[in-house]
A protein has these predicted regions:
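Beta-propeller fold detector
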Residues: 110-113, 283, 341-350, 406-414, ...
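N-terminal Sec-pathway targeting helices
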Residues: 1-15
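A short hydrophobic beta-strand element
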Residues: 140, 237-251, 373-379, 522-527, ...
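Short loop/turn segments that connect beta-strands within beta-propeller blades
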Residues: 336-339, 401-402, 450-454, 495-499, ...
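Surface-exposed, charged secondary-structure patches
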Residues: 20-30, 67-83, 94-123, 127-144, ...
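Core segments of small alpha/beta cavity-forming domains
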Residues: 36, 40-101, 106-108, 139-223, ...
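Extended, charge-rich low-complexity regions and/or helical-solenoid scaffolds
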Residues: 490-492, 502-536, 540-575, 580-582, ...
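Conserved active-site-adjacent core of cysteine acyl-enzyme catalytic domains
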Residues: 712-820
Length: 820
């Protein structure tokens, strides 16, 4: 018996040793292959404006292309100083320096090391004084370098030296408006007296509110939220007449299920200061719920995503077993049947959130998902935390459902800011099925990145806007061989899996133009050369008499030929193709109704996709329908994916330097962000006018602003160049004689072009009787000059607008910026 006991003890000890040894081996293996995303470590930098904290800046791990760093705008104090506060978190701040650059980054005006750093509560403080001369009313870039430990981290803001900006009045108004809305208190009438409620406003949703919403709606209805992260105002645009501010913050509230929920809120304010008070010109509020799987998120027909202002997207496998969706910086995967809900990726930190968590200058794009739940996705933009913290680029990940793990396959480092990078990746970002190649469009170039050897091949460069389209889900890329938007007769389609090209051509009296992709099927249009109108730059018309949907085998899947009208463009949203159409009249082309084409493989939206339900406190909520019936009270099994390294591999990393822009582009910034890009100034001004925004050129020079013009203006005609006085509107001749950039503003309104008169530049305008020169204006009239005459005359504003519109709103002026 004793021998048996001894033998049992020995066996137990051997087994324990074996288990211990195995666990050590497994533990070591996991340590080698499993990674936990590091918490955010970069400091935040704020501007201290007379005791008010504004313009929160997020750090970059490398120097960025300053042309793309158009975020906040900081007004200099009277002595040309910017006071900053650095929130170090766990960092030791050893030094701070700053550099002042021209708006395009081509000139460095000064580079200074701060000799004395201060301390205020939990912040490190520094005074950044601009010592060298800079122009007034001109924007510059301030690049701040903060050394935290052994790392140099870069922060960017625009600066301006200008008087009478009323900055503090705008800040006081915006923060006061926010507080009264949050507290539900409008006893002094501040809210009711500044908003413009009307019948068209949607007062049934908290997801999006604006200046036309009711006061009760702006005060959050029945939700009664509490502040979790208070807003730090960000100045986006600022001049003598108007200001644009944005505020990001987080609130918590108890919803209809009596569970605590969290929301990320963004508010946009456009204001004017007049008669000693601030006037609210425009206001918008977007609210997005931070998805919490611990709450009651399963409902009878799917997943409750809550309040969402953003256009959400989802992807599912062909069997509709797996549903993937991204929300507020996190990617989730839901498996029907098992009710497993996996957090595949998230930038949100564990524990208490801070401003780094809600910095949403990034985007998650789901490329594909298979019948086993395996997925490929991209992370594009600013990396809030992790090994790429502070970098701006594209990370390519794969998710393995069997092991609940993600693997980084490729990281593409760029110097392009998120606003531009996201538009490039939206056009094309595709990884091959065998995971050996990644295809990307970036700044007009098409790249093939070999993941196995980290090589980058630029397949095409200098592609013009409107001359190429891509499909990230279908793995296709199409481009006009001639690279001319209005004069190309060959459209090539490449299958990125096989590398095979298919060419689509037209008759000699026709031209082609790509529209987009529906999954992997290419949509393009055909126009007759005789119908194409390119006479007025910026108002070109490419009237397509037919639209074709084709596959990579060259087969025509559908032909669309509208009766009595033409297609001038289109857009694809999932499987829905929307076509913009015009009719031909004696005066040219006029807009008519849109038409829609639905792909034959479109999902049955009755069972799948997004739906909206009403509730008492939260009003309208989004549901992702999953095609199943879920019992009330069902809770999901929540899993969290781990990040692992591929066995024996490191993720490929490549860097693509900033490209020199060869195409003249105009950037429209509106409501605090990049709105759109155009190749013509007239299109850009029309869009900015509609969106209450601004236009900048390739050099980031401000080229047009909505609402920033003098009340009255009369120019000295003796200073007008002779070529302007001659009244000739020939663009080439004007460019040659002026030696400046000539702006063709055809299609813009009179009110829009008066901005240039206010800036001191005359405008040529066509009328039925010939050309006149706009030399000034007042509240009721334009001041006009006929070529060859020496005296100006007044003409009513409304009559002038009608006269110019009858002649096609044809205006020409030139850009005459202040020189250093």
């Amino acid at each position: 018996m004793k021998k048996i006991l001894i033998r049992i003890v020995v066996l137990v000890l051997v087994f324990a040793a074996a288990v211990f040894g195995t666990s050590k081996i497994l533990g070591k293996k996991m340590a080698d292959t499993s990674e936990v995303m590091a918490q955010a470590t970069f400091p935040l930098v704020y501007v201290d404006l007379n005791g008010k904290q504004i313009n929160c800046m997020h750090g970059y791990a490398q120097e960025m292309d300053v042309i793309a760093m158009r975020d906040t705008l900081t007004p200099l104090s009277n002595d040309k100083t910017v006071n900053i506060q650095i929130q170090p978190f766990e960092n030791q701040i050893s030094s701070v320096s700053y550099e002042v650059l021209s708006a395009d980054g081509s000139k460095s005006l000064e580079n200074t090391l701060v000799t004395t750093l201060g301390k205020q509560d939990d912040y490190v403080t520094a005074e950044l004084k601009v010592n060298n001369k800079i122009l007034i009313n001109t924007e510059y870039i301030m690049k701040i370098k903060v050394t935290a430990g052994v790392r140099d981290i870069y922060y960017y803001t625009r600066i301006i030296n200008q008087a009478n900006l009323n900055t503090e009045n705008y800040l006081n108004f915006a923060t006061g408006f926010y507080e009264k809305c949050l507290n539900g208190n409008d006893e002094d009438g501040m809210i009711s007296q500044t908003i413009e409620p009307n019948e068209d406003a949607d007062n049934t949703t908290l997801a999006h509110m604006d200046i036309h919403s009711s006061g009760a709606q702006l005060m959050w209805g029945k939700l009664t939220p509490q502040a979790y992260l208070k807003p730090i105002p960000s100045i986006k645009e600022l001049n003598e007449n108007t200001a644009t501010l944005e505020m990001d913050y987080v609130i918590t509230a108890t919803g209809d299920t009596e569970e605590m929920e969290m929301y990320h809120v963004t508010e946009y304010y456009r204001m004017r200061y007049a008669e000693s008070q601030v006037m609210l010109l425009d206001f918008e509020r977007d609210t997005n719920e931070i998805f919490d799987p611990e709450n009651s998120i399963l409902v009878t027909n799917g997943i409750r995503l809550g309040i969402n202002s953003r256009v959400l997207t989802y992807k599912s496998d062909t069997d509709k077993k797996y549903f993937a969706f991204a929300q507020q910086g996190s990617l989730w995967l839901y498996e029907t049947g098992t009710k497993k809900l996996t957090q595949v990726f998230s930038f949100l930190q564990n524990g208490k959130l801070d401003a780094r968590d809600i910095y949403d200058e990034n985007n998650i794009r789901i490329i594909n998902i298979d019948s086993s739940g395996n997925m490929t996705f991209l992370l594009c933009g600013y990396m809030n935390r992790g090994k790429h913290e502070g970098e701006c680029g594209v990370a390519v990940y794969t998710y393995d459902a069997a092991t609940t793990s993600i693997t980084e396959r490729l990281y593409v480092e760029t110097q392009e800011a998120f606003s531009l990078l996201d538009k490039d990746v939206e056009n094309l970002g595709y990884m091959s099925a065998d995971r050996t190649h990644f295809y990307l469009t970036l700044e007009g170039s098409f790249y093939d990145i070999n993941i196995t050897d980290n090589s980058v091949t630029e397949q095409f460069s200098n592609l013009s806007s409107g001359c190429y389209v891509g499909s990230s889900t279908g793995g296709k890329f199409a481009w006009l061989q001639e690279n001319k938007k209005y004069d190309s007769s060959t459209l090539n389609l490449r299958d990125l899996e096989t590398g095979n090209d298919t060419a689509f051509t037209c008759d000699s009296d026709e031209r082609l133009q790509p529209i987009g992709f529906i999954d992997s099927d290419l949509v393009y249009g055909v126009a007759k050369v005789s119908d194409i109108d390119t006479e007025d730059k910026g108002s070109e018309v490419f009237p397509m008499y037919k639209v074709l949907i084709v596959n990579s085998a060259g087969e025509i899947l559908k032909t669309y030929e509208p009766d009595g009208c033409y297609v001038i463009g289109g857009s694809v949203n999932d499987k829905l193709l929307t076509l913009d159409r015009v009719k031909k009249t004696k005066r040219g082309y006029t807009e008519t109704s849109q038409d829609h084409i639905v792909n034959s493989s479109a999902d049955d939206e009755a069972a799948y996709g997004f739906a909206y339900v009403e509730s008492d406190k939260k009003q309208t909520e989004t549901i992702l329908k999953t095609g199943e019936t879920i019992e009330e009270g069902t809770t999901p099994q929540i899993l969290y994916a781990k990040q692992v390294k591929a066995e024996g591999e490191e993720a490929a990393e490549v860097s693509i330097p900033a490209q020199k822009q060869t195409e003249e582009l105009y950037y429209v910034y509106a409501k605090g962000h990049l709105d759109s890009m155009y190749t013509t100034i007239s299109e850009a001004v029309q869009r900015a006018d509609d969106q209450l925004g601004v236009v900048v050129n390739n050099k980031q020079q401000l080229i047009w602003e909505r609402g920033n013009k003098q009340t009255t203006c009369k120019l000295d005609i003796s200073t007008f160049p002779d070529v302007i006085l001659s009244g000739k509107m020939n663009i080439k001749k004007l460019s040659k004689n002026l030696g400046k950039q000539v702006l063709d503003l055809t299609g813009c309104t009179l009110d829009s072009v008066l901005y240039y008169v206010s800036e001191g530049t005359p405008v040529l305008a066509k009328t039925a009787d010939g050309v006149v020169i706009i030399a000034g204006y007042d509240q009721y009239n334009t001041i006009l000059l006929k070529p060859g005459e020496a005296e100006t005359y007044y003409y009513g504003l409304e009559e002038s607008a009608d006269m110019f519109e009858a002649a096609g709103n044809q205006f020409v002026t030139y850009f005459d910026p202040l020189e250093e």
